[in-house]
């Protein structure tokens, strides 16, 4: 199939991937497959441990189960198709491309607001520990979980509908390894200024609102920690937040680098590195970040294993 067409709209797209070299493609295939398997194992393991251990049935771990679910889904939307493209055909249908983009934007937006909900939960746990169960009732937890999914769906719907109205009559070659907004906008043969502005406003609002919420929560948390007299108390309070803060820093750092800039500044190569982190690497890192530094998760794993041995 040729990269140039005379149609009013293309039937499919060609994803160029990350490299033209067969040796590099095979190395990337093995690396991404390993990362994806670790992602599956880590996130499914986190879901099972929290589900099986009653002591982890708290708001904090309720949010963490949804983070694992989103990361698992997030990675599955992109990685399997990327692996297939590295080995076989790099074609993707018009419908398949926009479906992938819809799921990607939906899950990415939901994760942004979920991280905000988790920050508020940490604020309630550290700043008002005696009233934590009153501040975080089940109804509020459900609202803080439902909100990110609803907003994510609405943002993604508006995003994809606005882009689907564009015409792609010139080239069908996407210089990326998955269907992301910037490289697809670059293919349109119609004016994209209004669509770009809409997407920029949506992405900017999502990042800014969630970041402001997270920042406000952590300013209050830091203020409370500094008032704690004992060193051990400060360390314990800080340890409950450091995992979330590390995850937030990595996730938002790559997101801001990629999306809060105009499409004309999109750079082939440079702007393909950051998406590898937030679509493939971060979903693998989150279970490690939230479990390796978390004594409660480690103890829960030991209890689950002991119960399994005792039942034999």
Swiss-Prot record:
Q: Which InterPro entries match?
A: GPCR_Rhodpsn, GPCR_Rhodpsn_7TM, Olfact_rcpt
Q: For side Cytoplasmic, which residue ranges?
A: 48-55, 121-139, 218-237, 293-312
Q: Which GO terms describe its biological process?
A: G protein-coupled receptor signaling pathway; sensory perception of smell
Q: Which Pfam families match?
A: 7tm_4
Query: What is one cellular component GO term in this UniProt entry?
Result: plasma membrane
* Compartments it resides in: Cell membrane
Q: Got any disulfides in this one, which pairs?
A: 97-189
Give the keywords, sorted.
Cell membrane, Disulfide bond, G-protein coupled receptor, Glycoprotein, Membrane, Olfaction, Receptor, Sensory transduction, Transducer, Transmembrane, Transmembrane helix
Annotated PROSITE patterns? G_PROTEIN_RECEP_F1_1, G_PROTEIN_RECEP_F1_2
Main location as per UniProt: membrane
> What family is this protein classified in?
Belongs to the G-protein coupled receptor 1 family.
- What protein is this chain from? Olfactory receptor 8H3
Q: Which organism is it from?
A: Homo sapiens (Human)
Taxonomic lineage: Eukaryota, Metazoa, Chordata, Craniata, Vertebrata
